[in-house]
From Swiss-Prot:
A molecular-function term among this protein's GO annotations: ATP binding
Family affiliation: Belongs to the class-II aminoacyl-tRNA synthetase family.
UniProt keywords, alphabetically: Aminoacyl-tRNA synthetase, ATP-binding, Cytoplasm, Ligase, Metal-binding, Nucleotide-binding, Protein biosynthesis, RNA-binding, tRNA-binding, Zinc
Obligatory cofactor(s): Zn(2+)
Name of this protein: Alanine--tRNA ligase
Enzyme class label: ligase
Function: Catalyzes the attachment of alanine to tRNA(Ala) in a two-step reaction: alanine is first activated by ATP to form Ala-AMP and then transferred to the acceptor end of tRNA(Ala). Also edits incorrectly charged Ser-tRNA(Ala) and Gly-tRNA(Ala) via its editing domain.
EC numbers, comma separated: 6.1.1.7
Gene3D superfamilies from the UniProt entry: 2.40.30.130, 3.10.310.40, 3.30.54.20, 6.10.250.550, Bira Bifunctional Protein, Domain 2, Threonyl-trna Synthetase, Chain A, domain 2
Major subcellular location class: cytoplasm
Catalytic activity: tRNA(Ala) + L-alanine + ATP = L-alanyl-tRNA(Ala) + AMP + diphosphate
Cofactor comment: Binds 1 zinc ion per subunit.
Length: 886
């Protein structure tokens, strides 16, 4: 059968047989293009290769690239589920030539694959070429034998590809499949081209020009090829279906959601099942590549995708959490092709489960607030965009959910007002942000790399070396010399200074020549391995080509080494304690401390933290040798080395192994084995001691620990001991008894607070100390007891109101408590005999409006609310009593 997995492997095997390097998919977060939200095409990772900024050992490549289009310029989110071919996640099959073969081979490879390997009928295929690309048209006639009618010339930009306003560009040739005259639509270039009969399945881009400016375009001396074929589209063709969602992969996912929910994918429910299947793929792959749901950037797009799927699960009537239960089905279909899914399975499941649990609460709360804010609106009205933004910003209720909920009532959202509120918030955020100040563009570093070559790093073996200055940069410009007092950057042909990367900060130290001393404050790695020494000339003048001596601050480096090695031990300790779903999400290694971010869906208990710390320190006490090896990537992974999700590695990697396997079970020899380019201790004992000082949340599903090592850890613990002794002195007890003494004092305080609170309740019920409003009054024939009380906790107000209801027998009771920070909390009770005519929820909302609150909630007999303006408590009670007067 032409399954999705078979089609993918057939494509890659075909081009491998034809001399192409088969490369793994790049991460969904582009490595070298900050202008892109997500990788959305096969050529994204090769942009610098096409422009000449990067070079590889191969000049032919083929990939199955995972892509996401759900944010920024390329955004298919709103169409997904309602059309046959829109997806948030898709796979792009491609073959690439970097100044190797050109049009003839590209056309031959494509035609041969489609007609010989995939066995498509020639009669079902037609192609387009750019209107003046006579070469491509002639090659199609020669290779395929297609008639002139089936080689269509297109004059629009659809058949001319550009990377940007400038850069490589060239004409395209698109291959179309004819689904037959039973489906409406005409061939490309015709009046009916928007129909679904003729579907593009492959695009060949002939990069033969370079756009220098809007008016000037020149021929490239060595043209290249970039092609892209959507796997889902070609699968639909080869499986004889017209709709991408009818291919085997989607049929399996949709069948699973139908079975779990118990609702068939028909009628009004058809689109919802398709949305869930598509969004499951994008959510799982984004999480596996290190994206976590959040309220900004890529994390916000992921959250929108997840919540859109979860909303459709809600529309289908799913009573239980759904998305995480579909993960095993997805992995059974795609895990072999994408092993990162298998490695991240538990994390994907936990994040989906956590997010869907939160979303259900958000959905319930958001719909309640939305209904309250829109009760006065009628069909055809506009909902206030500022309020819609507040629902999003404060309560996490996305705009698309607000629009969907109101659309059923014929109400639109003022999107312009929403956008203005969003822009205002972003402007305020930008005003509070300051950049790095580095005005040198990446192009400068690549230019230096091309002129003088990469910097040779010597820092693994030594902290002192000699070299020659190859470049000097001052104020963003390449210069020939730098003078006394000037801040600048120095590039040397070789260096022992480590350039900041992999979370490890750059080295500092001294670069000196015959006529100058340069103090290095930081070292960065730019472009393609160009090491930049950043600092200031302290004496003399430095010139290009000067011979220099480079000396790293060894004391600082020693602390950094200890902290970096400690992160590896803590990483493995976390996995041993919490589970294999723990993977690194970020780190910061400085001489003062270390910070380690990792995937985990909940906070870590003190007992777990102690175990994590103890495990790591057990390896420190082993004082075992830390081993560094250069290995083939496949061998390293086979040995158990941990690779980071979202990272792309070369064929040869540096592997750091440390510690003996404590369990002495299985094939794993080492305690920790990771791919890493940082600097490390020689023996684990050099770390001295590891002490975790904090554990916090960074984002949904991401936790952070901070720790100290060696002398810093010892001094920290000494400080803790000193504080315990000082506290013991204040409490007049021994350090060993401090905890017991503090617990006794806390128990006594709680007892006194309870007695005080009980006394305040009694006073309130008896009419005292409540601003003279605690007596029972009669308003419009209704008994009323109410007042303003001080320092009664909001949670105790309900008990106070219940007591008041018993005291008056029939009527309304309302108490407002004002806290020390000026906030007001209110509870209103209505006795059972009056709930047919009076509603406590309506009454408490009158109080809430006066207190500056958002409304309230509860039952007809008991409701609560609050507000920030507790000073208006008396005014709020007056408003309530006025409402009872009628």
């Amino acid at each position: 059968m032409n399954s999705v997995n078979n089609i993918r492997s057939t494509f890659l095997d075909y081009f491998h047989r034809n001399g192409h390097e088969v490369l793994s998919s790049s991460p969904l977060v582009p490595r070298n293009d900050p202008t892109l939200m997500f990788t959305n095409a096969g050529m994204v990772d090769f942009k610098n290769v096409f422009t000449g900024l990067e070079k590889h050992s191969y000049n032919r490549a083929t990939t199955a690239q995972k892509c996401v289009r759900a944010g920024g310029k390329h955004n298919d989110l709103d169409n997904v589920g309602y059309t046959a071919r829109h997806h948030t996640f898709f796979e792009m099959l491609g073959n690439f030539s970097f100044s190797n073969y050109f049009k003839e081979e590209a056309i031959f490879y494509a035609w041969n694959l489609l007609t010989k390997e995939f066995c498509l009928s020639k009669d079902k295929l037609l192609v387009t070429v750019y209107h003046d690309d006579d070469v491509a048209a002639g090659l199609w006639r020669k290779i395929s034998g297609l008639s002139e009618e089936k080689i269509i010339r297109i004059a629009t930009n659809d058949n001319f590809w550009m990377m940007g306003d400038t850069g490589p560009c060239g004409p395209c040739s698109e291959i179309f499949y004819d689904h037959g005259d039973k489906i409406w639509g005409g061939p490309p270039g015709s009046a009916d081209e928007d129909g679904d009969r003729f579907i593009e399945i492959w695009n060949l881009v002939f990069m033969q020009y370079e756009q220098l400016s809007k008016e000037k375009r020149i021929e490239l001396p060595q043209p290249s090829i970039d092609t892209g074929m959507g796997l889902e589209r070609i699968a639909a063709v080869l499986q004889g279906v017209h709709d991408n969602y009818d291919i085997d992969l989607f049929r399996t996912l949709i069948h699973a959601s139908q079975e779990i929910i118990g609702v068939k994918a028909t009628g009004d429910f058809f689109a919802s099942h398709r949305v869930i299947a598509d969004h499951l793929r994008s959510s799982a792959f984004l999480i596996a590549d290190g994206i976590m749901p959040s309220n900004e950037g890529r994390g916000y797009v992921l959250r929108r995708i997840m919540r859109r799927a979860m909303r459709h699960a809600h529309l289908l009537g799913s009573k239980d959490l759904l998305m995480w239960r579909l993960v095993p089905v997805l992995i059974s279909e795609m895990g072999q092709a994408y092993p990162e899914l298998v490695r991240a399975e538990s994390l994907i499941s936990e994040i989906l489960k956590l997010e869907e649990t939160r979303f259900r609460k958000t959905l319930e709360r958001g719909l309640g607030l939305l209904n309250e804010a829109s009760t006065h609106l009628e069909e055809g009205d506009y909902f206030n965009g500022e309020v819609a933004f507040k629902l999003y910003d404060t309560y996490g209720f996305p705009l698309d959910l607000t629009q969907d909920a109101l659309r059923r009532r014929g109400i639109s959202v003022d999107v312009d007002a929403f956008d203005k509120a969003m822009k205002r918030q972003k402007a305020e955020a930008r005003a509070n942000w300051s950049g790095s100040g580095d005005c040198v563009t990446e192009t400068v570093w690549f230019s230096i790399r091309d002129q003088v070559g990469a910097t040779e790093f010597l820092g693994y073996e030594t902290e002192k070396a000699e070299g020659i200055i190859t470049a000097l940069i001052r104020d963003g410009e390449v210069v020939d010399h730098i003078d006394l007092g000037q801040k600048a950057m120095i590039v040397v042909n070789q260096t022992p200074f480590y350039g900041e990367s992999g979370g490890q900060v750059g080295d500092s130290g001294i670069i000196s020549g015959a006529n100058f001393i340069f103090e290095v404050h930081d070292t960065q790695k730019k472009g393609d391995n160009v090491f930049i020494h950043i600092g200031e000339i302290k004496t003399g003048q430095a010139k290009k080509h000067d011979c220099v001596e480079l000396i790293v601050d060894s004391a600082r480096r020693r602390k950094i080494r200890a902290n970096h090695s400690a992160t590896h031990l803590l990483h493995e300790s976390l996995r041993q304690t919490l589970g294999s779903h723990v993977v690194q999400k970020g780190s910061f290694v400085s001489p003062d401390r270390l910070r380690f971010d990792f995937s985990h869906p909940k906070s870590i208990s003190s007992e777990e933290l102690k175990k994590i710390e103890d495990l790591a320190n057990d390896i420190v006490l082993q004082n075992s040798k830390v081993t560094t090896r250069l290995m083939a990537i496949d061998d390293a992974i086979a040995e158990g080395a941990m690779a980071l999700f979202g990272e792309k590695y070369g064929d040869e990697v540096r592997v750091i192994s440390m510690g003996n396997n404590l369990e002495q079970t299985g094939s794993k020899k080492w305690w920790s084995i990771e791919l890493c380019g940082g600097t490390h201790v020689q023996r684990t004992g050099d770390i001295g001691l590891i002490h975790i000082i904090s554990e916090t949340s960074v984002a949904a599903g991401v936790r952070r620990i901070e720790a100290l090592t060696a002398t810093a850890a010892r001094l920290y613990l000494h400080g803790q001991d000193r504080r315990v002794y000082e506290i013991a002195g204040l409490l007049k007890t021994s350090p060993a008894d401090v905890q017991e003494r503090v617990q006794t004092l806390l128990d006594e305080r709680r007892k006194l607070e309870k007695e005080l609170n009980d006394s305040r309740k009694k006073i309130a019920l008896n009419g005292g100390s409540v601003n003279s409003q605690g007596d029972i009054q009669t308003i419009n024939g209704i008994s009323f007891m109410g007042g303003v009380v001080s320092n009664i906790l909001p949670k105790d107000l309900k008990a106070l109101v219940d007591s008041g209801k018993k005291k008056i027998g029939s009527g309304v009771v309302a108490f407002i408590s004002v806290s020390e920070d000026g906030k007001g909390s209110a509870v209103v009770g209505v006795t059972d005999d009056l709930t047919d005519t009076l509603n406590a929820v309506d009454l408490v909302r009158i109080i809430s409006v006066t207190l500056g609150g958002q409304g309230g909630g509860g039952r007809r007999d008991m409701a609560q609310a609050g507000g920030s303006e507790g000073g208006k408590a008396d005014e709020a009670l007056v408003a309530l009593k006025d409402s009872l007067k009628g």
